[in-house]
């Protein structure tokens, strides 16, 4: 162990508070001093090393805590990846460990370097001239992961294949006019061009794909729709802690996952009852279905191959968020170890959500109604051509909802006039919108009235015709306890209304119900790729809609921690082989949501939002409707 620099004094932060700017700076300094890295070294991430659950649950405000930073560092000269843990209270390097056989994500700093070296390469310049492009500044070069499809003599290299786009005028749609067939291959560690592949000239698509308001004729503005709360919002914020109605939770943000929710609890009477310990995006992967050129390689892991959280948007009032808004800022470290302040990257506000419940009693001619309101916590991320909104909704009745909003621009392939597009669709002259999918995996570390939980699969069951079903209408429900990890890979069965309950068998209400929540999936798909395809070897988690594992603080990502260039490393399919018991223990559920995107002309030049998600609803958690005490609205005739 090594000591360096001055220890940092933190004013009694909560154990889950993200690292401050000074903490991040200290962590970087300590690592650099110990490892003697030169200026070419890169920091993939530096984040809070979250304490063990017990220390979080027993934390008392004002007490001192041990603060630790976790970092992933790339020594580009040696092509070695290291994990570091820094104790911030006494400025000590706890560990600095080489992790053999893995590669880090590609970083924004490398993308900028890559642009410069590719544009100076004579073979690239010559390839552009063959396509009639003389001005190198009219070309955007974007790196794409090679996945597990590298050439045999390049498998030892950390490298990338770049795709190019013609941007005739500043501000044009970057992705509307692909420069097809010209592919620079770049060694990222050495930052040199290995070669420039040219499979032949395809005409540049003619349509610039304008979508900016300053370049189009727009209709008159919509009539004003003002959202006001004269008395202010109902939520209270203390640092990263939020209290809204009966909900309490904490906001977090990490470089890879982006938005994280911690320690969600619901106040029932005089008790704050835990529901979820940690909720986060585990992975987002986008495989394409076109076999042309090198597009068959495209299946980007947006967390595993890029730094998802670093590509977050700064949100704007009136555009991204409406109403009485509270924003959260976070600090992150860039690839060179410099602290960057990210402003307004998490937005929180309330929304009216229509009717919560209503009944008109005809006999007494009396009507009761309550209006629903939800708390919205959201972030938006831009990963190349795609934009993703991650939204968490909390409702007055204890419901939790996750929603992903998919928008941005299509990733396109230029085609010859009259060329057939069996693996996509013609969305504009000369461009094929390639068929693809999006797979989200959400990690939910459940904590229903504590950590000892059990997952139960529930579905409807028809009773066979006979003495027990004389009228043919009888059906009941069937419950199956998921007892061990080997049985923890589960699939939807919409024909039977299948869902999953997470229950605490030691917490029972007066009706005999175990306290629980049920996961209600939304629309979903099965993988389109062949089981033995390169993509499926790396993304085995997409094979099942739900996975259940025993809690392990090191298992945060469905395909494993290090995805870049791997053939298919540790991840959910491997973890469940441990066959750990799952009854009355600390369990994690992982929900995979798949979206099939068959592009259409209406997706060009920019895509209207597609919505996907799931819902968690209390089941037996309360003894009756928990919103009976909600004040009625003021009604007007």
Q: What do these predicted regions represent?
A:
Residues 15-57, 107-150:
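Short, non-transmembrane alpha-helical segments in secretory-pathway proteins
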Residues 2-4, 24, 88-93, 97-106, ...:
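Extended effector regions of multi-domain proteins
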Residues 37-89, 135-187, 245-247, 377:
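Exposed beta-strand-loop-beta-strand "reactive/processing" segments of non-cytosolic proteins
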Residues 77-79, 84-112, 116-120, 124-126:
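Hydrophobic or amphipathic alpha-helical targeting/insertion segments
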Residues 1-16:
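Generic start-of-chain signal for non-secretory N-termini
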């Amino acid at each position: 162990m090594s000591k360096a620099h001055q220890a940092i004094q933190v004013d009694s932060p909560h154990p889950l508070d993200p690292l401050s700017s000074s903490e991040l700076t200290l962590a970087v300094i300590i690592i650099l001093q110990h490892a003697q890295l030169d200026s070419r070294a890169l920091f993939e991430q530096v984040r809070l090393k979250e304490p063990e659950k017990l220390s979080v649950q027993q934390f008392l405000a004002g007490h001192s805590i041990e603060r630790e930073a976790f970092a992933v560092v790339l020594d580009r000269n040696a092509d070695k990846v290291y994990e570091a843990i820094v104790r911030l209270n006494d400025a000590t390097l706890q560990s600095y460990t080489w992790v053999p056989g893995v590669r880090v994500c590609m970083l924004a700093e490398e993308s900028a370097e890559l642009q410069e070296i590719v544009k100076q390469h004579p073979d690239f310049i010559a390839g552009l001239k063959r396509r009639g492009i003389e001005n190198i500044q009219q070309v955007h070069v974007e790196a794409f992961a090679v996945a597990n499809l590298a050439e045999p003599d390049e498998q030892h290299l950390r490298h990338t294949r770049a795709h190019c786009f013609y941007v005739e005028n500043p501000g044009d749609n970057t992705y509307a006019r692909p420069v097809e067939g010209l592919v620079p291959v770049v060694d990222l560690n050495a930052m040199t061009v290995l070669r420039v592949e040219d499979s032949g000239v395809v005409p540049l698509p003619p349509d610039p794909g304008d979508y900016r308001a300053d370049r189009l004729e727009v209709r008159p503005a919509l009539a004003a729709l003002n959202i006001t709360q004269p008395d202010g919002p109902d939520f209270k914020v203390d640092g990263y802690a939020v209290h809204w109605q009966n909900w309490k939770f904490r906001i977090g943000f990490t470089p890879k996952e982006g938005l994280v929710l911690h320690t969600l609890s619901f106040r029932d009477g005089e008790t704050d009852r835990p529901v979820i310990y940690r909720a986060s995006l585990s992975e987002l992967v986008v495989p394409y279905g076109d076999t042309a050129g090198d597009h068959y390689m495209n299946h980007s892991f947006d967390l595993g191959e890029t730094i998802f959280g670093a590509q977050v948007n700064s949100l704007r009032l009136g555009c991204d968020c409406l109403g009485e808004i509270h924003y959260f800022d976070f600090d992150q470290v860039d690839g060179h170890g410099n602290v960057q302040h990210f402003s307004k990257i998490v937005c929180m506000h309330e929304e009216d959500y229509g009717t919560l419940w209503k009944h008109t009693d005809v006999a007494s001619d009396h009507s009761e109604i309550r209006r629903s309101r939800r708390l919205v916590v959201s972030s938006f991320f831009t990963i190349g051509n795609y934009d993703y909104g991650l939204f968490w909704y909390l409702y007055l009745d204890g419901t939790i909802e996750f929603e992903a909003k998919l928008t941005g621009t299509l990733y396109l392939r230029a085609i010859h006039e009259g060329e057939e597009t069996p693996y996509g669709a013609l969305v504009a002259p000369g461009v094929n919108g390639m068929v693809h999918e999006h797979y989200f995996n959400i990690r939910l570390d459940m904590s229903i009235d504590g950590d000892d939980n059990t997952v139960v699969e529930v579905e409807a069951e028809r009773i066979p015709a006979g003495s027990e079903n004389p009228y043919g209408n009888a059906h009941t429900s069937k419950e199956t306890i998921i007892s061990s990890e080997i049985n923890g890979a589960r699939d939807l069965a919409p024909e039977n209304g299948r869902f999953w309950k997470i229950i605490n068998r030691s917490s029972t209400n007066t009706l005999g119900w175990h306290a629980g929540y049920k996961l209600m999936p939304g629309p979903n798909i099965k993988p389109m790729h062949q089981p033995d395809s390169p993509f499926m070897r790396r993304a085995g988690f997409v094979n099942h809609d739900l996975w259940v594992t025993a809690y392990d603080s090191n298992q945060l990502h469905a395909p494993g921690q290090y995805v870049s260039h791997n053939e298919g490393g540790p991840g959910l399919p491997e973890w469940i082989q441990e066959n750990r018991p799952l009854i009355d223990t600390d369990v994690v559920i992982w929900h995979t949501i798949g979206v099939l995107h068959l592009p259409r002309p209406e997706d060009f030049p920019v895509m209207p939002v597609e919505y996907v998600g799931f819902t968690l609803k209390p089941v037996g958690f309360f003894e009756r409707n928990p919103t009976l005490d909600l004040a009625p609205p003021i009604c007007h005739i």
